[in-house]
């Protein structure tokens, strides 16, 4: 009877193996003999009210693992903080913690664009390709500077510039002006450095390719020029994107006002901007200055591109001239072969098995051979002269000269037309006086 009492607990486990059911029955029978009931599960765990299948357990474990993985791989920024005095602090922050501290949204720290300057909640967010920065009225944050070779600029040049010890022109203005100018100056110097590296390489390669001393074109030089041309195209794209980003800011007056962070956070600076120095105009002048610098770089890159295109035209002309020389030589050899074949028919005629009295004379061989070579040479010279006349450049068309009488008549008419108003005016005044 004790076994029948615990039988309903065994029914949900009917899917288990036969050996497991037998072991459970033996345990129940032993417990009944001892006068106490032993639960199927351990005392520390409570048996579930409904049976759990293997699929449910697998899904539960998968969700836990995915959550743990997401928590472990959360994006962490290596942050470098610069304050107004030039003090530098480096630390690490998770992305969620960072945008909560800066009062920004998660989308503001994605940095998806190649070049962008935006404002969010009295913060300036700048990205110039690999350089990511957040500017506030009190400090500057540089994000993810590792493996970018920025240590020299970050820890030696930038702190002194922000503290007012460098060569920036925005020292009397608030902190965000110095930060923006320092970042723009760094990026312009980077573009200028790329151009200064490419320019001598391209000019040296072009000089070697266009040199008239070399009759053939070196393929290795062409490969180097191709690689430098690709690098120049990338540089032109970077300069163009930089100019477009600056131009977008210059076209929007509201954006220029929003870039002046201290103006909206400090009442004293706001009064000073409204009565004395207009910070929006200063920001516009700053951006216009760097737009002109980028425009100068764009012009230099365009000049290099024009040189490459002109050199390419010269190279094609040289290749065409070499090709024409080879074609002309081939044509001359073809005409020579035709001439020899034409007068070689005489030798073919004597090579037939025909009897004639000419074969008995030994001088006839040399006579026929001489006639063959002389005739072939004459025909070849005639063909060459015909080819030369056909390949001569055509003369420019001669303009028909006008007769001298027509020119003199036209000059007289011009003189009369120029003197007619004055003569009429003078005659009228004389008649009026009379």
From Swiss-Prot:
Mg(2+) 3d binds at residues 351, 353. Pfam families: MRS2-like (PF22099). GO terms for biological process: lactate metabolic process; mitochondrial magnesium ion transmembrane transport. Mg(2+) 2 binds at residue 320. Residues 351-361 are mitochondrial intermembrane. It is found in: Mitochondrion inner membrane. InterPro entries: MRS2-like. Coiled coil: none annotated. It is a multi-pass membrane protein. A motif (GMN motif) lies at residues 351-353. Homopentamer. Magnesium transporter that mediates the influx of magnesium into the mitochondrial matrix and regulates magnesium metabolism. Also permeable to calcium, sodium and potassium ions. Required for normal expression of the mitochondrial respiratory complex I subunits. May play a role in maintaining the inner mitochondrial membrane potential. Belongs to the CorA metal ion transporter (MIT) (TC 1.A.35) family. This is Magnesium transporter MRS2 homolog, mitochondrial. It comes from Rattus norvegicus. The gene is Mrs2.
